């Protein structure tokens, strides 16, 4: 560890500082203000003749990103969470002895505390003239080169801390993510929703069709499943009397990784008694309008080279109409299992003959429709067979009162009128068990306690989930989900695999 020559040289400098009575890792150094505050507060000097205010004695801190020795003076650029600032000091300003120590031992990557006044250099750059410079933290590992930086995309994700040091834009993206979560939370609180927390480890893998992560509870001697979705617990709360609840938290799915999928991801799920899925679509449009406004994005944004118009109302189209309009498929084809199988095979897609009509229609949707839905589009009235927790339509028993929101070819939200008939729910679970026994690893399992909860009576309720990671991707124009997750899942390095062997 820390055994290359550059790291060893830095370690020796840290030792030398200790020998001089300077702790390279002091316990506490207090800064007075951020670099942004310093710039804003003292920008008035730009309008003065002298271009300086020596009556100021402000204390700031930051990481050294640039260090340049010019004769008997040192220019440096420090950076904090928000911005950067040039600092300047010389033998006269900090003292000859300290200057010599700093000149020899300060390096790019070190974190320093600086006290001084604002001034403008001869080249016109707003700067801080330092009277004190204290080492706050000695960096042992050198930063990547400024102009080449951390260019290996895999390394950026594996060493996010370095990525954040080198790329201010990365920090800005995660500030946007944090703001999005905060805005969503306050939006629902202002609507009268109650934020709750439900279990992350479930006795039954349920709430969505997905393959779970399995763990073991040593004390209880039983298997547990990391949460696929919080849905069934949140609906239990509606049964219990809370009429509007939401949860922002992690979900886990033991499936593949790609540009839009990470094994652990963040969602908001919310349930609203005495409302229907049309109310949810209206609420979702209102939420997007708020986010775009608060993030100063306007009603039209760019994502992956495409312009997306968020003007209300969003398009609403039935599942079957979308197959015809966007998929270019004939109405008689989408209602005929054999014709669907033939179409899929001819076009080179996998076609499982054991699937029922609703699942085959879903194959058509995935292959012919989804990528064409660019502007926000609510696709409504899904096949009941792929909607095991949704309420049946009163007009057509094969249709679920369900929608999904698609933007730029990706699903962003899923909502429906909740199934509150316990007998119907029990039968749906039995069909899911049949599907699982037939080889569908993602089929739901029976949850008799949930059915029992419905037996006590759940009021008419609508519920929805929104993937926050994909939402942030959209709002920051990022193609990969790993760009909006601080520490995304990564495949093990070969060296890590060898160590395990």
From Swiss-Prot:
GO molecular function: ATP binding; lysine-tRNA ligase activity; magnesium ion binding; tRNA binding
Cofactor: Mg(2+)
Any single GO CC term annotated in Swiss-Prot or TrEMBL for this entry: cytosol
Main location: cytoplasm
Subcellular location: Cytoplasm
Highest taxon, organism lineage: Bacteria
Enzyme Commission code(s) on record: 6.1.1.6
Matching InterPro entries: Aa-tRNA-synt_II, aa-tRNA-synth_II, aa-tRNA-synth_II/BPL/LPL, Lys-tRNA-ligase_II, Lys-tRNA-ligase_II_N, Lys-tRNA-synth_II_C, NA-bd_OB-fold, NA-bd_OB_tRNA
BP GO terms, sorted: lysyl-tRNA aminoacylation
Catalytically driven reaction(s): tRNA(Lys) + L-lysine + ATP = L-lysyl-tRNA(Lys) + AMP + diphosphate
Binding site for Mg(2+) 2: 411
Residues annotated to bind Mg(2+) 1: 404, 411
Keyword Aminoacyl-tRNA synthetase: yes
Keyword Metal-binding listed: yes
Name listed for the protein in its UniProt record: Lysine--tRNA ligase
SUPFAM superfamilies xrefs: Class II aaRS and biotin synthetases, Nucleic acid-binding proteins
Pfam family, one: tRNA-synt_2
Keywords: Aminoacyl-tRNA synthetase, ATP-binding, Cytoplasm, Ligase, Magnesium, Metal-binding, Nucleotide-binding, Protein biosynthesis
Protein family according to the UniProt entry: Belongs to the class-II aminoacyl-tRNA synthetase family.
Catalytic class of the enzyme: ligase
